[in-house]
Amino acid sequence: MIESAEVHKFGGSCLVRREDLNAIVRRVDSSTSQQILVVSAFHGVTDRLLDQLERGEAANIDAFTASIEMTHIELVPEIGSGPWVAQFKQTLITLKSNLHGYLDTPSDTMRAQILASGEKLSSLALCSVLTANDIHCHPAWSEEVGIYILGSGEDGVIDVDRIRDHLTFDLESSIPVVTGWYGINESEEITLLGRGGSDLTATSLAAALDAREVTIWRDVSGVLSLSPRWSLPSRNLSYLSYTEAVELALFSEPMLHPRAVEPLRSLGLPLRLRPLHDDGVDGTRIGPSVLTLSPRVRAVGCLPRLSPLRIELGAAGSVAPTIAQVSEILGRARISVWSLRASPGEALLLVSERAAAYATRLLSELPQPPRYEIKPPVTLLSFVGEGVGDDAEVLESIRSAADASDIEIVRLESSEHALRYTVPSEQTEIALERLARRLDLLT
């Protein structure tokens, strides 16, 4: 237990320019607490590694590895002469060898090793910058730290109890710079988490160490009541409950890994999302629920470009098996089902437009394929706020605002903290603007 410790996570959006690294140095240097840093790969590096794996070209592996090296050296010249130069060069040699090996014998393990190189190089680069500024630190790779992952990909979670039992950091003498996004499985093989998994690395470490708080540094001011992509003057949210944050993480722009708050819940540890470059903004704090006398919608999550997939169901006795079969085949294909509603005679699933054709092909290949049709695209709106699910006033506000603007809104499901609806894709922007205005979410 290191109650005075803080965990700081720096993602790829904060690892783009030299100014970003200088800002990280200032943040680390100004802290009076013991610190653990978690890093993602430099901006764009993971995508480049993925592209290289997909191309599968042996002829350009040397040039590709050299370009990855140059990306880090141009941003962090100190890495070429500092204490981590040998480890930096060896990591690049291993990357090149693994790329050649993957061409000969592709495997999930080799692929994970290649992709994890981005985080390893990032940790070495950041250590080089910090060391050059007289900040004592060391790279702490996940396989060395003992970050064990149960499951993999979007379903992967970190074994917090195992970290708690075995992790030893001497934080008084050196700041560990931990690689995010990946860990090891029971066979000691590199295993990746899902998109945004570095968030989960940071919160799992915070829970294991019983740290004071965890901060995820970003390139924006905090969480807004509406995603910035819609260009509406949205309110900045100073506080979110764990539950509200999970809903927004699932049904909005990627602001946080959906599982990131889970290690923190039972301990009540706070999580902050803060802008790296703005000292005057506290960002958004995430923590336990705060009871209010009058429930209100605090934010709207929005998932556009979804295709409703209508499936005809047979007799009552075959409904559950059919839905289970469809869910299983789509799950195996990694097709996310954002909503599933069953009624007498039919089921309605929401999948992304991009996945709709693939989903129907899978259904048509079943031994006894069900009848199905793809309906016009919709947008899923999630109205988020503690206690809104059963609040008649909130329900009436949404319905009356939609009726006043002739918005074809359809209610899907609700929970204690969220109300979910769909609107036709072509009505997305007007629905967001009119509903957000009625719910007082705009400035």
Region annotations inferred by a language model:
Residues V145-Y148, G222-V223, D279-V281, E346-A347, ...:
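Short secondary-structure capping/turn micro-motifs that flank functional sites
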Residues S33, I135, L269, I335, ...:
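Short phosphate-binding/catalytic loops that engage adenosine nucleotides
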Residues M1-L256, V261, S352, T422-Q427:
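Nucleotide/pyrophosphate-binding catalytic subdomain
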Residues S241-A315:
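A conserved active-site cap/scaffold subdomain adjacent to cofactor or substrate pockets
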Residues G283-T443:
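A conserved regulatory-domain signal marking ACT and ACT-like small-molecule sensing domains
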